[in-house]
Amino acid sequence: MAHPYLFRLDERVARGLSHWDPTSRERHHQFLLSQQNPDGGFGGRGIPVEYANEEPEGRDSDLYYTAFGIRGLAALKLFTSQDARRVAPFLEGTRHYHATVIDVVSWLYSALMVQAATGIDLLAQASADWPQELAARLEGFRSSDGGYSKTHEGAIGSTYHSFLVALCYELIGQRLPEPDKLVSFIRSRQRDDGGFVEISPMKRSGTNPTAAAIGVMTLHSAVGPNLRDDVLGYLADVRSDEGGFQANSRIPFADSLSTFTGYLTCLDLNEKAITDPKRLEEFILSLQHPTGGFRAATWDQSTDVEYTFYGLGTLGLLWSESK
């Protein structure tokens, strides 16, 4: 089985961040550890930045943020066996809580990372055909348009959640059923500006659904020269004067999520010239909090594990290319 995309991406980021000075790495390491709850999971934002390193009261653990906490630690090559053992009980307690596509992918990624770090197999008690059972569960999210919805009740496909399902199939080593229908669904989400939208009624493309669309198309070897040129043209339009990428052409500021996904898409399309590496680096570094963690944008006042990963991820990709 080919090495899954998510793990290849983690390795690219970690390779770049290995060039960073130890003091900066440790500052963000300590921030990430401070966001872990007593039950072993990680929670989202809700703490003012000045209290970010204090006890995270009132912030429940969540599979989505737990996966980002693990990804951040892995990016720094600091997801230790001790860290993994602290996470394992939370994952064991949430193994059947898979109401959304995000829950499924977040749990599976986290469980595989725990197994790699400790040897603890959270699927040891599952039946031998659990990959096929999980694949059947994933098909419960499939919509009539060929894509995948956020929940089982969803009526129309989501570009982002379709990408997550494609990643999940790769993680479990199963073939996604009727891939041509998924590719056609993704193509239907492209708009005249060259980018892609999240759901069908939308007219204006977004950086993040465009990145998700290219992710799906890349996994299925469906990126041709015309599509590449269209998407690169769109990404050039959403470059910000700050050095990063905007969420869409009407949002007047860059954010770290859009910058991470936009820059990753440029790299995956073998195009580095759209961004100025120095300005990109300066923008992301400006989002650091002095005590660790990254904010979403220059206006933001809070840090969390998700946006910390986007900050680390962008720097890791940038430095893996330049150093």
Q: Which residues fall in each region the model found?
A:
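Long, well-ordered core segments of solenoidal/helical folds
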Residues: 23-41, 81-99, 128-147, 176-195, ...
